Amino acid sequence: GGGGGGGGGGGGGGGGGGSPDQLRAGVASGQFKVMMSPSNVGVNLRNQGQKVGMVNILTNGITQLVCKGSAIASPQDLVGKKILVPFKNDMPDIVLQALLKKLKIDAHKVSITYAATPPEAVGLFPSKGYHAVILPEPMATASLLKGKTIGINVVHGFDLVKAWGQAFGTKPLIPMAGIIANEEYFHAHKAQFDIFHQDLKNALNWILANRQNAAKIGKNYLPAPEPALVMGLDGARLTVSKGSEVKNEILKFYEILMQFNPELLGGKLPDNGFFLA
C-alpha cells in the first residue's frame, strides 16, 4: 500500500493536487509544514522570509510535449503553432519560456494559451485548434490514450528535458519538484524524515518493479486511468533524491532561472541552509 502512496506523491509534483498559489498561501499562514512544491517555489518563499527549506527532489522532469497529428520534432518547430500550457508562470511555462529564450526563438511567434490546471488542459486539447499541449505525467499519457478513443491522432513531440539539456549544456534532467518543509518542523522531526526518505525510496523501487499493481493504487489518487499510469511512469522521471545529493544539479537549474527571470526565485540564489536533508 505504501508503494502506491509514494507514486501518488510523485504525481502531485506535476500539479496533481492544488495550485502553486494555494501552496504559497498555506506556507505564509503557517498552516502547511510539509509540502510538495515546484523546486523554484521553495527558494522564492525562503527569499521572502518564510522559514522553509528543501527536503528532496521527486522528479527530474515530469512534463511532456504532446502533439496532435504529427509530432513537433524540435523547439524551433513550435514557431507558428498553438500550444496549451497549464499554470502560467509556473514550472511547465517557465521551462518552455526559458528554453525558447535560450535558443533565441521569438516567443511571440509561438501562440500560447494558458489553462488553469493540467486536467483542464487535457479537456481543452482535443476540441480546439491546438497543435500541442505541455502536460505532466500521467496526464500526458492520458491525453495520448484519450486521443485514440475519440479518433484523434495524438503523439509525443520532442523530449522537453533532453532539449533543455542540449540547450543549456546540462545533464538531461530538470529537478522540477519535490518536498519542502518548515525548517523548525524538519529539525524537530529529523528521525521521522529519515524514515520517510527510506520509505519513499522503497516505494519508488516497488512501483518500478510492480507497475500494474502500482497503477491500481495510483488511479485512486491521480486524475488518470490505470493504463496511463503504467505507460507514463518512465516519462515521469521519478526519483527520490535528498536535496544535498543533487545540490549541484539544483543550483545549476537555479542559475539558469536567475538568468531567465530572477523573480522566479525571489531575486537571489538560496543560502546553504536551504538544503535541509
Which ranges hold each PLM region?
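Short, glycine-/small- and polar/acidic-enriched structural segments
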Residues: 1-106, 111-113, 131, 137, ...
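Soluble non-cytosolic domains of exported or imported proteins
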Residues: 17-21, 36, 86-94, 119, ...
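Solvent-exposed, polar/charged alpha-helical surfaces in well-ordered, non-transmembrane soluble domains
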Residues: 25, 29, 43, 76, ...
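Pocket-lining segment of extracytoplasmic ligand-binding domains
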Residues: 39-41, 120-217
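Short, surface-exposed acidic
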Residues: 107-110, 222-234, 265-271
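Surface-exposed patches in mature extracellular/periplasmic domains of secreted proteins
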Residues: 112, 207, 214-217, 265-270
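Secondary-structure end/capping motifs
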Residues: 186-260
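Conserved C-terminal helix/tail region of periplasmic/extracytoplasmic solute-binding proteins
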Residues: 251, 255-277
